[in-house]
């Protein structure tokens, strides 16, 4: 994921407040629990030296009623005088945390990257469609609708929608056929209007998923009008009706299933890309020291961290990645085993790039056994020196 919106944080002088908290409010008890958990964090942060004024500002924004539904989290990064980042997380953090330190803490944010799915749900009928922008990238509390509104709609403006049932008699035949043609034309023109809107949103929002539900005939007409970019990310979700889909528990469950399936497929694709590069000696490498060196040389196009098994220098690696415009992704441990919990896809490699073979990567048992704590050389450097000899 491109996290360039974090760059201004790294260009600001610290110290920093880094707060990650489960902000789900499904009932009064969860809202009360949020207030209690924040109260404990606020006391700790004040003891650590965080100014009371900024803590008061954070408390106000954190505890105010939120329109965001479902399970989610909140990430707040601030200096001692101003909030720099206030973001809704697409899932609660792995654990609540709050820090007052010289550098911002980023790993809890990175751990929920896989759940950040940019998707648009389209409930279509023969007159138009209702649009729901769900889990957009980097949603803000103040503008969680991202310009669409919670229930944005598109109406084609062609309202002759129903074919009449006309009794027998040849005198009615031409009228019936003519009306049917006008109705079909209205449906098609309405589909064109919806498709034009969706194509524009797909281009502007860089969506991951376009979810389509509603009237079966309207879906078919809409698909005939959509551009290639929209069709490439289209997924049909059965059981929906315009204006009613999200009120149905069964539909919400199906929507969650389709989204989870996409997340798993995307994780597997990233793991496959990394593994394929490793197996053919391509533009990838792994291991904390190797990745750090590649980041310093500006070689990394995408930093990859294992969720829950990040290396000790993960925060430093993340800052280096942001400083060199590298993307950052996180993978579940079940998808790939990254030595020391870190790997990278490279922009390029040369003779100075660390070896890409599995036997030479950090995390290899033989290599770790050969480590000499009294030596200033890394295992890789000693291996290369032995080869030269």
Report residues per predicted region.
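Terminal alpha-helical anchor/extension segments at protein ends
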Residues: 1-389
């Amino acid at each position: 994921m491109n996290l360039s919106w974090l760059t201004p944080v790294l260009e600001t002088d610290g110290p920093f407040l880094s707060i990650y908290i489960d902000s789900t409010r499904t009932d009064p008890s969860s809202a009360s629990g949020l207030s209690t958990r924040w109260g404990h964090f606020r006391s700790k942060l004040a003891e650590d030296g965080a100014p009371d004024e900024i803590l008061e500002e954070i408390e106000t924004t954190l505890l105010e009623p939120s329109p965001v539904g479902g399970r989610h989290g909140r990430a707040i990064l601030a200096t001692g005088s101003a909030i720099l980042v206030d973001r809704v997380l697409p899932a609660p953090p792995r654990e609540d945390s709050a820090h007052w330190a010289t550098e911002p803490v980023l790993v809890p944010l990175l751990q929920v990257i896989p759940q950040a799915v940019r998707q648009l749900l389209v409930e279509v009928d023969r007159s138009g469609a209702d649009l729901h922008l769900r889990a957009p990238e980097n949603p803000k509390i103040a503008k969680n609708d991202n310009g669409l509104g919670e229930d944005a709609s598109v109406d084609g403006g062609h309202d002759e929608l129903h074919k009449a049932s006309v009794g027998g008699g040849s005198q009615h035949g031409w009228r019936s056929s003519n009306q049917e043609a006008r109705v079909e034309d209205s449906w098609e023109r309405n589909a064109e209007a919806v498709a034009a809107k969706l194509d524009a949103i797909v281009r502007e929002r860089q969506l991951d998923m376009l979810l389509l539900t509603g009237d079966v005939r309207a879906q078919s007409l809409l698909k005939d009008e959509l551009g290639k970019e929209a069709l490439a990310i289209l997924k049909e979700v059965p059981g929906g009706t315009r204006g009613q889909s999200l009120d149905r528990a069964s539909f919400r469950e199906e929507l969650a299933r389709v989204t989870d399936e996409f997340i798993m497929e995307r994780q597997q694709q990233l793991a496959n890309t990394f593994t394929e590069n490793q197996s053919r000696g391509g533009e990838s490498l792994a291991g904390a020291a190797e990745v750090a060196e590649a980041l310093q040389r500006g070689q990394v196009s995408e930093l990859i961290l294992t969720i829950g098994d990040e290396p000790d220098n993960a925060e430093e690696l993340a800052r280096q990645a942001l400083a060199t415009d590298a993307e950052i992704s996180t993978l579940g441990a079940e998808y790939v085993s990254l030595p020391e919990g870190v790997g990278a896809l490279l922009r390029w490699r040369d003779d100075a790039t660390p070896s890409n073979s599995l036997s030479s990567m950090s995390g290899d048992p033989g290599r770790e056994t050969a480590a000499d704590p009294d030596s200033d050389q890394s295992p890789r450097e000693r291996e290369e020196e032995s080869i030269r000899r």
